[in-house]
């Protein structure tokens, strides 16, 4: 029976501990932050004889919210844009599709264990392999090696597109439609490799 009484006393002890916390004890914490907080804690202390502990906590929360609003307002006026630009600078920029595809190709060439097939990267490489700006000359031999292993419909489609592009360039050659010699050379290399 005595144990039950002690449990009952502990339960009330917890409640009384909550009630014992007064704003006066919290004053050192609040006074460290600034003058606005000091005035808020004095307001709570002045009202403490009249207010219950619950009402004091509610009042403290309201005052804390008001302080936060004022602080945000001051920051906005001071130029919060500076902090926003700092956040933007800390975020890493996403790599472009070109860099991702070229890294994919280099990973394949080095036979890295982390390399795995990615259809989107392969598609990008197949679409842009004739463009010297997007796939530099230094990466093109590696791309040709990659194309040797190309299988299935991707291989057939690449051959068809290369043949169609070659016919288009041959027909437009007398007019010189802008087919660069590098592009034509790349087309021939791809056709020789895959045909």
Curated annotation (Swiss-Prot):
Pfam families: WKF
Compartments (UniProt record): Secreted
Phenotype upon loss of function: Intestine-specific knockout mice have elevated plasma cholesterol levels with increased cholesterol synthesis and VLDL secretion.
Residues with the Phosphoserine modification: 41, 48, 52, 96
One GO MF term: hormone activity
Any GO BP: negative regulation of cholesterol biosynthetic process
Feature: compositional bias, Basic and acidic residues: 8-18, 26-39, 53-77
Tissues and organs where the protein is expressed, per its UniProt entry: Secreted via exosomes, secreted from the instestine, secretion is induced by feeding and cholesterol absorption. Expressed in enterocytes.
Role: Hormone secreted from the intestine in response to cholesterol, where it acts to inhibit cholesterol synthesis in the liver and VLDL secretion,leading to a reduction in circulating cholesterol levels. Acts through binding to its receptor, GPR146.
Stated name of the protein: Cholesin
């Amino acid at each position: 029976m005595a144990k039950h009484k002690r449990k009952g006393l502990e339960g009330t002890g917890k409640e009384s501990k909550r009630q014992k916390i007064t704003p006066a004890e919290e004053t050192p914490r609040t006074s460290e932050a600034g003058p606005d907080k000091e005035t808020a804690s004095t307001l709570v202390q002045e009202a403490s004889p009249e207010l219950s502990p619950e009402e004091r906590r509610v009042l403290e929360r309201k005052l804390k919210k008001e302080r936060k609003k004022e602080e945000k307002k001051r920051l906005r006026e001071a130029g919060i844009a500076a902090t926003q630009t700092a956040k933007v600078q800390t975020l890493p920029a996403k790599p472009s599709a070109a860099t991702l595809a070229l890294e994919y190709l280099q990973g394949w060439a080095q036979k890295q264990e982390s390399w795995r097939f990615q259809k989107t990267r392969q598609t990008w490489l197949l679409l842009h392999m004739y463009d010297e700006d997007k796939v530099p000359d230094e990466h093109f031999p590696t791309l040709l090696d990659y194309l040797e292993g190309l299988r299935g419909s991707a291989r057939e489609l690449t051959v068809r597109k290369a043949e169609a592009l070659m016919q288009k360039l041959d027909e437009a050659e007398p007019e010189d439609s802008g087919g660069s010699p590098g592009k034509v050379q790349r087309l021939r290399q791809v056709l020789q490799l895959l045909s």
